[in-house]
Every structure is written in C-alpha cells, then in structure tokens.
Amino acid sequence: MDDLKAKYLGQIAEATDENALEAVRLAAVGKKGEVALKMRELGKMTPEERQVAGPALNALKDEINAALAAKKAALGDAALDERLRSEWLDVTLPTRPRRQGSIHPISQASEELTAIFAEMGFSAQEGPRVDTDWYNFDALNIPGHHPARAEMDTFYMHRAEGDDRPPHVLRTHTSPVQIRSMEKLGAPLRIICPGGVYRADYDQTHTPMFHQVEGLALDENISMANLKWVLEEFVKSFFEVDEVELRFRASHFPFTEPSAEVDIRCSWDNGQLKIGEGDDWLEILGSGMVHPKVIAAGGIDPEKYQGFAFGIGIDRLAMLKYGIPDLRAFFESDLRWLRHYGFSCLDVPTLHGGLSR
C-alpha cells in the first residue's frame, strides 16, 4: 500500500496539465486502475485479511482522490493566472469614444432660416399636416378645377361611403398655416411656417414628403419693394455672402397677384456652387403679393391690409448650401451619410456666432 501511495501521489505532484492528471487518475483509481484491481482481489482473501486490507485500500483511494482534486484546483488556478497575464487589460487607458448623435441637415437648415427671419421680426407658426381641402385649396384661391387638386398630385384621406365630413388631405404646402394664423392673430402680421408637406412625386429632385418654409407679412402699405429687401437679406444671411443679386421673373400662383419666381446669380466651379457671382441663374423660390381673396379668407380686410408671401423648399436650400447631390438621401436613414453631413448638436445657429459650422 505504501508503495502505491508513494507512486501515485508522486505522479500527481509531477502532473503539469489536466491531461497528465487524468492519465494518473485512470491508472490509479479508474475502473481498470491498480487500486480497483486490488479491490477485486479482496474476494480471494480470508476474512481476517479483508478486515485489514479493505479499510487500507479505501483510505488509499480517498487519499489519491483528494490529491487529484487538490492538484486539479491548483492547475486551474495556474491556468487562470496565465490567462489573466496574457489577456491583461490596462484599465487606466481611455475608453473608446462614445458616438454622439448629430443634427440632420434639414433640421439644421430649418433652425438657420428660423434664426434669420426671427432677426427680421418673423415668428414661426405651425399647423396640422392633415387638413381640410378648404384650408389647403379653397382659402388659398385654388379653384376646384386646378391641376393641384387632382389625386395624381395630392394625397386624399380615405372616406367610407356615406361619410359626409369635408375632404381631408395631406397638406401640399404650409400655406394653410397662413390662413389659420390670420384667423388667430389678425393683422399686422409677420410669420414663417416651416414644416413637412406631401405630394405624389418621386425622383432625384422630388420625394413624396419634403419640407417647406412659407412666409407671410401683412400690414398697411406693404409693397414688392419690402418683399425684395426681405428676400435679399435672407439669401445673404443663409448663404453667408456679402452681396447677392436676385432676379424676379413674372409667374402665376393662385394665392398671389402679382407673382414672381426668384432666381439668384451664381456660378459653378468644378461642381461647387458659388452664390452671388458668375453668369448663371438658379431658381430658389416663389413669391408675390398676397391675393385679396386669400386675405379675406383669413378674416382680414384686404382694403386696409396688403401683404407679401413667399415659399422656399428647405430640402433644396440644404442641398445647395451643404453640397448634397440627391434629395432622396435625406430620407434613407443611412447613419454613414448622416455622420458625414450632420451637424453638432451644440452648434446652435445664430447670426452673431455664425449659422453653420
């Protein structure tokens, strides 16, 4: 017994890994190990011999199992120590920077133009995106036969048979907010109405949903000269140029009379737009003097008050200023695109600190 004990305890002590230790266990206390074979020989012994050999073999087996367990624990601790040394992590190193969100270019452009018009005394007003066709069309002097009222251009809300409520549409412009503001605030009035609008169109420069800002100024003795000054100041501030030349072209809009589309002098240098210089012209907005019928629809006397209005595509402004080639990219939720074109949430646009940085 002493020889077996010395033999296997020595082998256990010399085992360098769990595979070697398992081999010792099988040779010593496995089903075919030496201790197991000795146990089988107990049947051949006399009762007196079994009384001496049995307890001694059990004690040897227990001692070997205890040594195996202790050695296995020691090998496990050693392996863990080695793993910790090889996979050491310096907790004093700075962590990977956490990504911050960024401001979408449309939101940035909206904030910038709101700041510009606020300096000129315009307040921002909002209205429902689902509105009646009266606010969206009739109140704006858009007759029933006008092409804009066709279902191919306008999203109409579904009505069940027998539903006699007035037709509702997804607003095709933010002009309904002008009517609601006239009803609510009266005159004199200076407002802008930024927000999302909807039209049934989709290509590189059109999407079913886009953003507009429309402006309205009502007062006594307002003229096209006031409109021209406001638009010039806006364009200079938004594109951050000292001088700008605008060209007013006669046009037709049902809600203004006279009406004008406004172009801006510009040039293209290797695909880069330069505002205020060059021989090219770029259309940027529509405008005009508010039609008397529209003023009357807002509950204001058109004999006493006149006004001007303008409409600008915010998405188009953002494309021109930030060099974005495809309008559809605004709505594709591509984080890589947003990280490239997005703005810091801490850069609040002001005319004093600079609009976009």
UniProtKB/Swiss-Prot annotation:
Its main location: cytoplasm. Mg(2+) binds at residue 257. Its cofactor is Mg(2+). It is found in: Cytoplasm. Keywords: Aminoacyl-tRNA synthetase, ATP-binding, Cytoplasm, Ligase, Magnesium, Metal-binding, Nucleotide-binding, Protein biosynthesis. It is an enzyme of class 6 (ligase). One of its GO terms (molecular function) is ATP binding. This is Phenylalanine--tRNA ligase alpha subunit. SUPFAM superfamilies: Class II aaRS and biotin synthetases, tRNA-binding arm. It comes from Ruegeria sp. (strain TM1040) (Silicibacter sp.). Its EC number is 6.1.1.20. GO terms for biological process: phenylalanyl-tRNA aminoacylation. GO terms for cellular component: cytoplasm. InterPro entries: aa-tRNA-synth_II (IPR006195), aa-tRNA-synth_II/BPL/LPL (IPR045864), Phe-tRNA-synth_IIc_asu (IPR004529), Phe-tRNA_ligase_II_N (IPR004188), Phe_tRNA_ligase_alpha1_bac (IPR022911), Phenylalanyl-tRNA_Synthase (IPR002319), tRNA-bd_arm (IPR010978). Tetramer of two alpha and two beta subunits. It comes from the Bacteria. Binds 2 magnesium ions per tetramer. It catalyses: tRNA(Phe) + L-phenylalanine + ATP = L-phenylalanyl-tRNA(Phe) + AMP + diphosphate + H(+). Belongs to the class-II aminoacyl-tRNA synthetase family. Phe-tRNA synthetase alpha subunit type 1 subfamily. The keyword Magnesium applies. The keyword Metal-binding applies.
